[in-house]
């Protein structure tokens, strides 16, 4: 499943919409997403699953590039 993650780059930053970044990640669950991103110390605001029509829309209208976490 593909997830869209809204985050701030620094854990100490107060969330400000203009500074929010987005990445797309393939994972089995929201917990799996958070586990994979834990080592980056991001301030994760929201994790959203992207499926069906929403996924097609993101592919056509957004820069949907899956992040590879090693």
From Swiss-Prot:
One of its GO terms (molecular function) is DNA binding. Coiled coil: none annotated. It comes from the Bacteria. A non-essential component of RNA polymerase (RNAP). GO terms for biological process: DNA-templated transcription. RNAP is composed of a core of 2 alpha, a beta and a beta' subunit. The core is associated with a delta subunit, and at least one of epsilon or omega. When a sigma factor is associated with the core the holoenzyme is formed, which can initiate transcription. This is DNA-directed RNA polymerase subunit epsilon. It holds the Pfam family RpoY. It catalyses: RNA(n) + a ribonucleoside 5'-triphosphate = RNA(n+1) + diphosphate. The lineage of its organism: Bacteria, Bacillati, Bacillota, Bacilli, Bacillales. HAMAP family: RNApol_bact_RpoY (MF_01553). GO terms for cellular component: DNA-directed RNA polymerase complex. Signal peptide: none annotated. InterPro entries: RpoY. NCBIfam families: PRK13667.1. Its EC number is 2.7.7.6. Keywords: DNA-directed RNA polymerase, Nucleotidyltransferase, Transcription, Transferase. Belongs to the RNA polymerase subunit epsilon family. Transmembrane segments: none annotated.
